[in-house]
Curated annotation (Swiss-Prot):
Homodimer. The tRNA molecule binds across the dimer. Its main location: cytoplasm. The gene is serS. It comes from Aromatoleum aromaticum (strain DSM 19018 / LMG 30748 / EbN1). GO terms for molecular function: ATP binding; serine-tRNA ligase activity. This is Serine--tRNA ligase.
Length: 427
């Protein structure tokens, strides 16, 4: 959530930054609500001052034995107007807060301008795509040939955009997630957390999914309210610090969690309908950091490097891009995407998105720390995929496929596969 004082004092600069994101910001509507707020507050203050003056006069009149009925009647009228103003102001502040809650984060100064993904800037590549001496297959055909990837049964059970995995492929999927968790906890210093997959509306608001993106979420209604299936572990993990006041010396907090993620994929009709690239349910290992404001931008570079380390250990070619202003997520101030090479598509596809949100989520969550001067200050929050497990599986299948339909297990994964070095096609 943006700082409302920034909107009040630097509205032109905010409008320009939001325009660079392609966000719809009605400055006139905000100014109108602000003018109404100021008028109400000024009138309320005037009435309170008049009531205080009259109360003193009533005391003097009564002490003299004089008639105070007129002054008392005026005080009663003021009380009625104050009550009406209080209700009107509360309603107006709700409108203002809802308006501000619908505005995305402001881009960091280092973010390149642009309207869409075509303006994203590649800043690095790692690895050389493998040259095949046979016609490559995509992950769907490879997985089916291994007898481990079954979309037909998944569709019978649930519908489109679901996958069922069996045997060696299911084990490889599990091994990837465990490998990622072990690297991030043992080598990168993250604390593993196991979190709920259903969260309340306050949690979704805190990380920025609500109210703007409700159509993209799955939810269930129970007697004690509505719960949402998490679209990413960023939601429950980041909300660990909602409404918390932390000591400055506990920062940074570094969390990692492995969860399924659930997305309706509203607006993606017809895109990536084949295979596991775009699913309603998929697994992800998520990195979340709670940082001191002075350390958050360096932390973004480090967090992104931790996600890159997984790709390098798996020896998967990838590229790193910084997203332009028009392609960033709602809560992000700056985002790096990591895109892995998929031989069957002959292109790089997103496998990780790493973002710093600054104080944007912290303000929505009221996540604060007490600084060295003893003052309360908002933390900064960061998140990133480390990595999307299903897409990593896709990349392994396609990059490690062999001419006979088998798939070589990446060397680094063999211990997590119980010594299995090759997945053989079914006979």
């Amino acid at each position: 959530m943006l700082d409302i004082q920034l909107l009040r004092t630097q509205i032109d600069a905010v409008a320009a930054a939001l325009a660079a994101r392609g966000a719809n910001f009605d400055a006139a509507a905000f100014q109108s609500m602000e003018n109404e707020r100021k008028t109400l507050q000024t009138r309320t203050q005037d009435l309170q001052a008049r009531r205080n003056t009259l109360s003193k006069q009533i005391g003097v009149l009564k002490s003299r034995g004089e008639d105070a009925s007129a002054a008392m009647a005026e005080v009663g009228g003021i009380g009625d107007e104050l009550k009406a103003n209080e209700q009107a102001l509360a309603t107006l502040l709700e409108r203002i807060n809802a308006f501000v809650a619908g505005l995305p984060n402001l881009p960091h100064d280092s973010v390149p301008p642009g309207r869409d993904e075509s303006a994203n800037v590649e800043i690095a590549r790692w690895g050389t795509p493998r040259e095949f001496d046979f016609e490559v297959s995509d992950h769907v055909d490879i997985g089916s040939g291994l007898g481990g990837l079954d979309f037909e049964t998944a569709a019978k059970i649930s519908g489109s955009r679901f996958a069922l995995m069996r045997d060696g492929l299911a084990r490889l999927h599990r091994a990837l997630a465990q490998f990622m968790l072990d690297v991030h906890t043992r080598e990168h210093g993250y604390t593993e957390v196991h979190v709920p997959y259903l969260v309340n509306p306050d949690s979704m608001f805190g990380t920025g999914q609500l109210p703007k993106f409700e159509a993209e979420l799955f939810s269930v209604m129970k007697d004690d309210g509505r719960f949402y299936l998490i679209p990413t572990a960023e939601v429950p993990i980041t909300n660990i610090v909602r409404n918390e006041l932390l000591a400055h010396d506990v920062l940074p907090l570094k969390f990692v969690g492995h969860t399924p993620c659930f997305r309706s994929e509203a607006g993606s009709y017809g895109r990536d309908t084949r295979g596991m690239i775009r699913q309603h349910q998929f697994d992800k290992v998520e990195l979340v950091r709670i940082e001191h404001p002075d350390a958050s931008w360096a932390a973004l570079e480090e967090l992104t490097g931790h996600a890159e380390a997984i790709l390098r250990k798996l020896e998967l070619p990838y590229r790193k891009v910084v997203l332009c202003t028009g392609d960033m997520g709602f809560s992000a101030a700056k985002t790096y995407d990591l895109e892995v090479w998929l031989p069957a598509q002959k292109t790089y596809r997103e496998i990780s998105s790493c973002s710093c949100t600054g104080a944007f989520q912290a303000r929505r969550m009221q996540a604060r720390f007490r600084n060295t001067q003893g003052k309360n200050e908002l933390v900064h929050t960061l998140n990133g995929s480390g990595l999307a497990v299903g897409r990593t599986l896709v990349a392994v299948l396609e990059n490690y496929q062999q001419a006979d339909g088998s798939v070589v297990v990446p060397k680094v994964l063999v211990p997590w596969m119980g010594g299995i070095e090759v997945l053989e096609p079914r006979g």
